[in-house]
């Protein structure tokens, strides 16, 4: 099995194991059967066994006798050997031609690297069957198990409701026509988040619905939970409607999302005309009126809110003088409050009971540095199911109804201190002491004072209860208001009071006007009234987990605008269709309409208002106007009037679309502009900070925020400078304000803040806004999902127990399309909070991305090209900064070492060397020894210990390398470059033998042995070129020689062979027996085979100096011989090639086919290759003696051949060199062309890369063995072509030895040594 494919390996192992197991089983059964049969045949076997043995022995003897003689000879001489004999050269005395034979061998190369197979793994372990179905919202949960979502049919676990942490805010479901969402399989590790059941969630397929609910396979529902506030989940039996796909887009978490989760669901269902059926919790009325269907719709928000308040809710059985049991019921969970809802009373909690509750809670606050708790105000749609059904709401509503005649409300009914706290603070909230805040710009920080934050949820039910009358009777200051009918109803709707003892004991809210007895207030369109909302806010807290301050608010009182209708608490069952009405009808802007647009939350800090409360008295709110008119009121800003009232206008932006009824979800970026984070660098310090959270579908400009944030930079404006507030009528009956400051508008468009120091100087600011215009029509109502938050944060607020009355007035008026504002209006400008960012993208971005996803690949590329063309350099630079890190991941370092090495093994060695220069980690991996060993194996590089390796470190020129195989490869690479392209160093010239011919040449290690016709042999050092020894003893010319280690054997015309000791130069043995010139020899181990002109071959033992065998059979002089230790192959002038068995002294095969003298041989144990004067080269089979191939192509005598791994290179007297494949008989390359030799090729050498050839033209050429291309000339004699000849060459990986001379005396006889090794290579020399 190939490595790198674990899947395939495991499968193969498994298959092999199965086959082995089956084989063992089969063999076992066979053995059992054979035992039974053997027991029955025992006696018969004993009788006939001896005869069978004799018969088998006889048959074996006959087979042995009948073996062929050739087979016996082969088996007798079956000892393989690799020839390392020297180059023997014999001058043919008869023909005067040189016979060239080469036997120098290079290491064999291994086969090609095995490829890595990749086997795909089929994961068939899953057995779940996914069945998709469209949910039927009209059926209960019991029927959803078989029709809704994806489920596993094999799962029999009981249904369970799991709570999953909703952290994947950035995921966007694919837009599809169906309501099916992608499967969500998320296991929540928080055990306390499991609401229903104690069993874990079954591992089944789940369907995510659009309202944040996941429908499991068994019919159970999984409700997502945000990480901010823990929420209670509805009953599993409830049916939850689904929304559109686009409404599920994630957005930044904020507190308003947590508190309005139920409102969002309810608004969605109201838009779809559906009703969420749930168990009624704390109904406001004992006998609520029936709706259209006779079924009361309730919101899930009641349950969700109770969990956030640690399940501390107000019970419905409070009386005017509550008992301690009633107090205990006030702290009971919501589930218990459902049973007590029938005993509600119209009186509020007594102060004594509230004080007793405060004593318990004060201990918690004192341990938290006397910080106040959160006060949560929930005002949802006036439809009854969206109300917080708490007893305090009804009791306060009843109290305010009783006071309609007098038009005043008692301030004692409005507790603002710890005595009036009715609920405990949520322990999950994070409280922060202002004295310890990291901002250093707080100038009036007081450690005694606590920071309180008020959260005002200005939903469409802000005026659900009838408008309460202002305590100061501000309505009497306006004549037009006296003639009009305003709204006064049950104030303090949906109130949760949670204050600190340092707050004011009473803050009474009042609103001008009187209410009708029916709980709703209507008036003619011609009458004009000024609407204002007074907020007495206390108890703020700052959330650490968001950039904006988390706030809660209390005591809202609303005054409806002209021509509006306010729905009271008694209209609990008023349906959405009833409240929508006709488009031309006038109704309150806070009434619930069928066009469920996003509602807004306005969060006001109590400390900010307390700062205003200490400096102001109730003013007279005046306003005049008529329907369709655009009046303009001039308002002056004063600092020295202690009786001035600060009127803060908050224009609640309507959702765009002209009342089309589109449902806007908080997660839909296309329908709203998300809120930005508070910037520390933008002076978010102890100065007042306004956090505006928009939810509009119209323009990207925060127009409704601009009226408060941008227009009034109150600390920098002149006290006497007038502020012009122009009121213009907009389309669809909406009212829009254009607030301009002609002299200082542009200079005040900066961070929204109120300088606390200026406020303490005694100056308050009065802003009176006169509003008029038709309110109503399609989409005129402020819906449930809009939210707007305003936070006023002050560090030091003087605490006082005196009654200060209402001081700050917030006028909330719906606004129309911001695009219709005038160019100079501040409403058309974007506030700093709406600047787009990564977490706050523009609304159109989501649509653009959705369209981009629908395009094909080519269309996307085109869109990107166009996008880049329209980008300026700064934007292109931003793209580069984002894209570049994606391509800079160090995947090699991240992988395990084994996998990283496996990846690197596919790189070429030169690429590995470059990769090693990347970093330390990559160098460590790229230097792996086994990795480079494989590279060396493929390149046929042997890393044996060599004495001529170059030095490393200080003395050498190569850096030290940890991996020996890498060092060997790098050294070989440098050597190859020296051969191929680098300048040839000046050769060493070894002069000797005078003017005689060098007839034989041997080279091994650092020693060179040359034989000449001057009867001598010389031993040279290949390192320094010195002549080490001169071997004298022959009486005739030396025409053949062999060399092995320290032994030199020479053959001469004196018919003897001599064995020499290289170190001492002494002749060890003289081998006599031949009767003519010893023309050729081949040494293998301790035996040497010699061929002579006497037509015989002799086998000698060089250690004993004796003749072992004499082989007789040739008819003419033996010209060439090869010996591998087992068989001897000889070629002679009788045109024949013989294969001998030396031990038996017999000829196994006579290879006949040549038609002329045989001059050269090559033998590798399997094949015999013979070159003849007949220009042919024949390939013979050793076993059969048959001729396998006849290689034709040369035109003359084949003077020399080299054979390595089925590759044969032959040099011919026709000046060409050919490369053959002896297995196929094809000519692979012909080394010729314009750079070919100009005369006969005398000798050649080759390895796996190069072919080196010498010629009578006096040149030595280098060729590429694979391509046959000419590389360059290594040697070019000056006398070349005029008599200079290169007779013999020998080469290894680093050196080339050339025997040079001439026939006419034009070139001196010498040896040239060319070194291609790495510079600095040091070899041991003697």
Swiss-Prot record:
Keyword entries, A-Z: Cell cycle, Nucleus, Phosphoprotein, Repeat, Ubl conjugation pathway, WD repeat
Disruption phenotype: RNAi-mediated knockdown in the posterior compartment of the larval wing disk increases cell size in the posterior compartment of the adult wing, resulting in an increase in the size of the posterior compartment as well as an increase in the ratio between the posterior and anterior areas. Knockdown of the gene is embryonic lethal. Neuronal-specific knockdown results in deficits in habituation learning, as demonstrated by the light-off reflex habituation assay.
Keyword Membrane: no
Gene3D superfamilies given in the database record: 1.20.1280.50, YVTN repeat-like/Quinoprotein amine dehydrogenase (2.130.10.10)
Acidic residues composition bias: residue spans: 165-187
The name this protein goes by in its record: F-box/WD repeat-containing protein 7
Function text: Substrate recognition component of a SCF (SKP1-CUL1-F-box protein) E3 ubiquitin-protein ligase complex which mediates the ubiquitination and subsequent proteasomal degradation of target proteins. Probably recognizes and binds to phosphorylated target proteins. In the wing and eye, negatively regulates cell growth and proliferation by mediating the degradation of Myc and cyclin E, respectively. Required for endocycles, but not mitosis in follicle cell epithelium.
């Amino acid at each position: 099995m190939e490595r790198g494919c674990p899947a395939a390996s495991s499968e193969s192992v498994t298959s092999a194991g199965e086959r082995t197991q089956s084989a063992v089983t089969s063999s076992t059964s066979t053995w059992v059967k054979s035992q039974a049969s053997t027991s029955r045949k025992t006696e018969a076997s004993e009788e006939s066994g001896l005869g069978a043995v004799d018969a088998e022995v006889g048959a074996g003897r006959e087979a042995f006798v009948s073996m062929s003689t050739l087979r016996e000879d082969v088996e007798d001489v079956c000892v393989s050997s690799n020839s390392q004999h020297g180059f023997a050269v014999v001058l043919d005395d008869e023909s005067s031609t040189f016979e060239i034979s080469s036997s120098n061998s290079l290491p064999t190369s291994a086969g090609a690297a095995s490829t890595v197979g990749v086997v795909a793994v089929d994961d068939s372990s899953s057995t779940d069957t996914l069945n998709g179905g469209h949910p039927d919202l009209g059926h209960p949960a019991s029927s959803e198990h078989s029709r809704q979502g994806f489920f596993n049919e094999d799962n029999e676990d009981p249904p369970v409701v799991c709570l999953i942490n909703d952290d994947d805010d950035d995921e966007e479901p694919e837009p599809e026509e169906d309501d099916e969402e992608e499967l969500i399989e998320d296991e929540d590790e928080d055990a306390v988040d499991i609401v229903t059941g104690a069993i874990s969630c079954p591992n089944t397929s789940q369907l995510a619905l659009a309202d944040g609910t996941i429908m499991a396979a068994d019919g159970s529902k999984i409700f997502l939970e945000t990480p901010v506030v823990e929420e209670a989940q509805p009953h599993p039996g409830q049916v939850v409607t689904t929304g559109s796909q686009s409404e599920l887009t994630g957005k930044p978490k904020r507190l308003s999302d947590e508190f309005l989760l139920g409102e969002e669901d309810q608004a969605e269902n109201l838009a779809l005309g559906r009703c969420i059926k749930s168990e009624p919790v704390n109904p406001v009325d004992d006998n609520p009126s029936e709706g259209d269907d006779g079924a009361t719709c309730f919101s899930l928000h009641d349950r969700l809110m109770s969990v956030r308040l640690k399940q501390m809710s107000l019970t419905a059985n409070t009386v005017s003088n509550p008992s301690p049991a009633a107090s205990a019921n006030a702290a009971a969970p919501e589930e218990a409050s459902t049973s007590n809802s029938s005993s509600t009373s119209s009186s509020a909690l007594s102060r004594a009971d509230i004080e007793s509750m405060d004593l318990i809670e004060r201990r918690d606050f004192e341990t938290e540095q006397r910080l106040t708790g959160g006060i949560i105000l929930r005002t949802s749609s006036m439809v009854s199911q969206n109300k917080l059904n708490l007893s305090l709401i009804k009791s306060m509503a009843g109290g305010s109804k009783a006071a309609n005649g007098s038009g005043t409300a008692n301030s004692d009914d409005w507790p603002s201190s710890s005595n009036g706290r009715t609920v405990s603070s949520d322990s999950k909230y994070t409280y922060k002491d202002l004295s310890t805040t990291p901002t250093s710009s707080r100038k009036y920080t007081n450690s005694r004072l606590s920071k309180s934050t008020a959260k005002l949820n200005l939903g469409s039910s802000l005026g659900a209860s009838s408008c309460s009358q202002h305590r100061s009777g501000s309505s009497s200051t306006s004549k037009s208001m006296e003639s009009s009918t305003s709204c006064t109803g049950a104030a303090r709707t949906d109130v949760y009071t949670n204050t600190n003892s340092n707050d004011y004991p009473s803050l009474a809210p009042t609103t001008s006007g009187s209410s009708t007895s029916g709980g709703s207030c209507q008036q003619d369109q011609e009458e004009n009234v000024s609407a204002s909302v007074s907020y007495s806010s206390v108890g703020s807290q700052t959330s650490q987990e968001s950039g904006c301050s988390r706030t809660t608010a209390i005591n809202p009182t609303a005054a409806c605008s002209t021509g509006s209708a306010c729905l009271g608490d008694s209209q609990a069952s008023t349906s959405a269709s009833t409240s929508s009405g006709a488009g031309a009808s006038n109704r309150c802007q806070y009434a619930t309409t069928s066009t469920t647009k996003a509602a807004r939350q306005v969060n006001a800090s109590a400390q900010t208002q307390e700062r205003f409360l200490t400096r102001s008295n109730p003013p007279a709110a005046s306003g005049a106007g008529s329907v369709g008119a655009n009046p303009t009121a001039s308002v002056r800003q004063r600092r020295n009037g202690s009786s001035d009232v600060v009127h803060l206008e908050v224009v609640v932006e309507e959702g765009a679309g002209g009342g089309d009824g589109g449902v806007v979800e908080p997660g839909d970026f296309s329908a709203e502009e998300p809120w930005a984070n508070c910037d520390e660098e933008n002076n978010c310090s102890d100065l007042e900070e306004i956090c505006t959270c928009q939810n509009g579908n119209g323009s990207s400009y925060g127009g409704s925020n601009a009226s408060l944030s941008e227009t009034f930079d109150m600390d920098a404006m002149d006290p006497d400078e007038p502020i012009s507030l122009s009121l213009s009528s907009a389309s669809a009956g909406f009212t829009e304000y254009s607030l301009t400051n002609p002299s200082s508008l542009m200079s005040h468009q900066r961070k929204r803040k109120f300088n606390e120091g200026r406020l303490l100087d005694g100056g308050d600011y009065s802003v009176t806004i006169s509003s008029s215009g038709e309110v109503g029509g399609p989409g005129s109502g402020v819906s449930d999902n809009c939210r707007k938050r305003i936070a006023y944060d002050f560090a030091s607020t003087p605490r006082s127990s005196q009654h200060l009355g209402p001081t700050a007035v917030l006028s909330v008026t719906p606004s129309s399309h911001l695009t219709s504002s005038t160019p100079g209006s501040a409403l058309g400008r974007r506030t700093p909070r709406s600047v787009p960012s990564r977490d706050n993208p523009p609304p159109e971005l989501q649509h653009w991305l959705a369209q981009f996803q629908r395009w094909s690949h080519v269309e996307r590329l085109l869109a990107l090209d166009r996008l880049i063309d329209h980008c300026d350099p700064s934007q292109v630079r931003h793209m580069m900064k984002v894209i570049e890190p994606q391509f800079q991941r160090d995947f090699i370092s991240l992988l395990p070492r084994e996998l990283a090495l496996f990846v690197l093994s596919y790189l070429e060695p030169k690429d590995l060397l470059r990769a090693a220069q990347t970093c330390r980690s990559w160098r460590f991996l790229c230097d792996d020894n086994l990795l480079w060993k494989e590279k060396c194996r493929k390149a046929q590089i042997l890393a044996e210990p060599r004495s001529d390796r170059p030095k490393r470190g200080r003395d050498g020129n190569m850096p030290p390398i940890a991996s020996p195989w890498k060092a060997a490869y790098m050294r070989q690479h440098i050597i190859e470059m020296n051969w191929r392209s680098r300048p040839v160093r000046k050769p060493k010239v070894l002069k000797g033998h005078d003017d005689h011919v060098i007839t034989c040449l041997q080279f091994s290690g650092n020693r060179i042995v040359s034989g000449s016709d001057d009867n001598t042999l010389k031993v040279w050092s290949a390192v320094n070129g010195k002549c080490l020894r001169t071997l004298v003893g022959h009486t005739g010319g030396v025409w053949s020689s062999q060399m092995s280690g320290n032994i030199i054997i020479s053959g001469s015309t004196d018919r003897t062979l001599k064995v020499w000791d290289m170190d001492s130069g002494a002749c060890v043995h003289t081998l006599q027996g031949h009767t003519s010139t010893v023309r050729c020899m081949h040494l293998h181990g301790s035996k040497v085979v010699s061929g002579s002109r006497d037509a015989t071959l002799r086998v000698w033992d060089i250690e004993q100096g004796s003749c072992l065998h004499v082989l007789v059979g040739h008819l003419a002089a033996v010209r060439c011989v090869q010996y591998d230790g087992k068989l001897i192959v000889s070629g002679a002038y009788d045109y024949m090639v013989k294969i001998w068995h030396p031990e038996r002294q017999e000829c196994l095969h006579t290879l006949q086919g040549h038609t002329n003298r045989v001059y050269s041989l090559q033998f590798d144990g399997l094949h015999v290759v013979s070159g003849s004067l007949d220009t042919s080269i024949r390939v013979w089979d050793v076993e059969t003696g048959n001729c396998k191939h006849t290689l034709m192509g040369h035109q003359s005598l084949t003077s020399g051949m080299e054979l390595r791994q089925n590759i044969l290179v032959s040099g011919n007297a026709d000046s060409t060199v050919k490369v053959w494949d002896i297995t196929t008989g094809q000519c692979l390359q012909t080394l010729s062309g314009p750079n070919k030799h100009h005369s006969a090729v005398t000798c050649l050498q080759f390895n796996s890369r190069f072919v080196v050839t010498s010629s009578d033209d006096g040149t030595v050429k280098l060729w590429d063995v694979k391509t046959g291309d000419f590389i360059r000339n290594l040697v070019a004699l000056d006398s070349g072509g005029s008599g200079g000849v290169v007779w013999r060459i020998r080469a290894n990986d680093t050196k080339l030895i050339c025997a040079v001379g001439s026939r006419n005396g034009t070139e001196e006889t010498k040896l040239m040594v060319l070194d291609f090794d790495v510079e600095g290579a040091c070899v041991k020399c003697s």
